[in-house]
């Protein structure tokens, strides 16, 4: 098992020497095995391993006992342990979601907060190959899109680094063999036997039937997941390119239009992905009652060449076909008169529509990087002049420590910014339209750029009176 996991880590570049790793630990066999495995790599790889356990307080004394068990084992194993308690029941009542979803959201909020607080490179979770099989078959019964089989990703960008799952290459039985051979203690969660939870039903009833004649199904599932994820990444890029070439926005970014011929002449695989991209642009959050039926109606509508007809989607989104010209818009939504795009010289002072101001000046000194309303920009890292604008469809940015990019929409959601505030939120870009500063939330430049020599620009945000 050890060599299989090490080969898997190397293949997917899951770890680097000298990294700081937070391990999500529940006290069960999977997470305890992962913590033990990474602890044994600590000296060889010069990594720092931190255990993070979260008490969901769903099982009374058992939940408390799980937390104490993890803390005590970490103490005796010389592993730093961080413990949190969350109130899942209160979250359920406040947001009216299921127990499973409430627990997951709270868990990942803490994961993200601790990743940033500790400056960790990785969050390691103990999902294994059988979890992958469960996920694939659960999605098959609920999702009618090709990415249903992407399954659980081996790694993805998360908080200050990456979320990794080194155990996706092994199954539950191999993990149980590992903890037995290495005398790693663990606790049994009795709720795992309760089939009222969807995943437990698949785990206890469906998966045993599938693996009865093929114990290595988890390997096939993982290969399928990886292959389809590679294919989907390529198709997603092509769909983005298609949208850029075909779609036309009005000046207020409140209406989309395109020629049906320009759209339907593309491969069907790209058409479907472009359709979903368009909906993601128009909706801040996709409605729960949006289904494959709407997709079928959309494609039936856009193929018409004559006459005027329309269909209504959830939340009053209208899709209209007028003699081959397709338009998507919200009839009852007022145009965004607050859209702006303003040049920013240096030095300068620009007043925004809400009365706030952004000032710019040349400096040689550095700035406290924790100031939310200021940013230091090394001039050799940007294309001048700078611009201040509101959001555009598909806006993404990156920052120090983030692998890849992140949608501005997701940043606002993470920060719990109300939808009505996002349309007027000031964004600073350079002349190449690279986002430098999502004012008050994210900066593209980290502390390493602050320390660079050379001339810099200091931007400051001052709130208005209206």
Swiss-Prot record:
Task: Report the enzyme's class at the first EC level.
Answer: ligase
Species annotation:
Oceanobacillus iheyensis (strain DSM 14371 / CIP 107618 / JCM 11309 / KCTC 3954 / HTE831)
State if Nucleotide-binding is listed as a keyword: yes
- One GO cellular component from the entry? cytoplasm
Task: Supply one GO molecular-function term.
Answer: tRNA(Ile)-lysidine synthase activity
What is recorded about the domains? The N-terminal region contains the highly conserved SGGXDS motif, predicted to be a P-loop motif involved in ATP binding.
Question: What EC number(s) does its UniProt record assign?
Answer: 6.3.4.19
Location in or out of the cell: Cytoplasm
Q: Per its UniProt record, what InterPro entries does this chain match?
A: Lysidine-tRNA-synth_C (IPR012796), Rossmann-like_a/b/a_fold (IPR014729), TilS/TtcA_N (IPR011063), tRNA_Ile_lys_synt (IPR012094), tRNA_Ile_lys_synt_N (IPR012795)
The UniProt catalytic activity note for this protein reads:
cytidine(34) in tRNA(Ile2) + L-lysine + ATP = lysidine(34) in tRNA(Ile2) + AMP + diphosphate + H(+)
What protein family does this chain belong to? Belongs to the tRNA(Ile)-lysidine synthase family.
The residues listed in the UniProt record as binding ATP, with positions renumbered to this chain, are 26-31
Keywords from the named record: ATP-binding, Cytoplasm, Ligase, Nucleotide-binding, tRNA processing
The protein's role, per its UniProt record: Ligates lysine onto the cytidine present at position 34 of the AUA codon-specific tRNA(Ile) that contains the anticodon CAU, in an ATP-dependent manner. Cytidine is converted to lysidine, thus changing the amino acid specificity of the tRNA from methionine to isoleucine.
Q: Which GO terms describe its biological process?
A: tRNA modification
| Domain of life where this protein originates | Bacteria
List the protein's name. Answer: tRNA(Ile)-lysidine synthase
* A Pfam family reported for this protein in Swiss-Prot or TrEMBL: TilS_C
């Amino acid at each position: 098992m050890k060599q299989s996991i090490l080969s898997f880590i190397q293949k997917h570049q899951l770890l680097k020497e000298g990294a700081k790793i937070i391990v999500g630990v529940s006290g069960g066999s999977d997470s305890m095995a992962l913590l033990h495995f990474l602890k044994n790599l600590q000296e060889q790889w010069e990594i720092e391993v931190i255990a993070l356990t979260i008490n969901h307080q769903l099982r009374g004394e058992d939940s408390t006992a799980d937390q104490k068990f993890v803390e005590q084992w970490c103490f005796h194993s010389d592993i730093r342990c961080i413990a949190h308690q969350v109130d899942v029941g209160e979250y359920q009542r406040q947001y009216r979601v299921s127990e499973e979803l409430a627990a997951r959201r709270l868990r990942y909020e803490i994961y993200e907060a601790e990743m940033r607080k500790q400056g960790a490179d990785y969050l390691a979770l103990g999902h294994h190959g059988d979890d992958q099989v469960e996920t694939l078959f659960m999605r098959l019964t609920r999702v009618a899109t090709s990415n249903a089989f992407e399954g659980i990703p081996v790694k993805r960008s998360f908080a200050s680094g990456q979320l990794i799952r080194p155990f996706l290459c092994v199954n539950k039985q191999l993990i149980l063999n590992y903890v037995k051979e290495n005398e790693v203690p663990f606790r049994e969660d009795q709720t795992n036997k309760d089939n009222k939870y969807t995943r437990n039903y698949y785990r206890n009833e469906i998966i045993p039937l599938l693996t009865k004649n093929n114990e290595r199904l988890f390997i096939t599932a993982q290969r399928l997941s990886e292959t389809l994820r590679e294919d989907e990444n390529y198709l997603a890029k092509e769909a983005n390119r298609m949208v850029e070439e075909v779609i036309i926005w009005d000046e207020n970014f409140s209406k989309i239009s395109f020629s049906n011929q320009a759209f339907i002449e593309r491969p069907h695989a790209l058409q479907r992905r472009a359709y979903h991209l368009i909906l993601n642009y128009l909706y801040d959050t996709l409605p729960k009652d949006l289904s494959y039926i709407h997709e079928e109606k959309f494609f039936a509508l856009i193929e018409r060449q004559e006459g005027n007809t329309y269909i209504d989607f959830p939340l009053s989104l209208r899709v209209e076909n007028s003699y081959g010209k397709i338009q998507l818009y919200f009839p009852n939504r007022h145009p965004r008169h607050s859209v702006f795009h303003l040049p920013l010289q240096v030095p300068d002072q620009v007043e925004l529509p809400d009365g706030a101001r952004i000032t710019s000046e040349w400096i040689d000194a550095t700035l406290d990087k924790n100031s939310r309303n200021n940013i230091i920009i090394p001039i050799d890292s940007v294309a001048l002049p700078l611009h201040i604008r509101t959001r555009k469809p598909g806006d993404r940015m990156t920052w120090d420590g983030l692998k890849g990019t992140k949608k501005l929409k997701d940043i606002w959601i993470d920060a719990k910014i109300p939808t009505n505030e996002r349309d007027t939120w000031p964004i600073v870009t350079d002349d190449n339209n690279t986002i430098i500063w999502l004012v008050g939330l994210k900066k593209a430049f980290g502390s390493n750029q602050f320390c660079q020599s050379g001339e810099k620009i200091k931007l400051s945000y001052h709130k208005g009176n209206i």
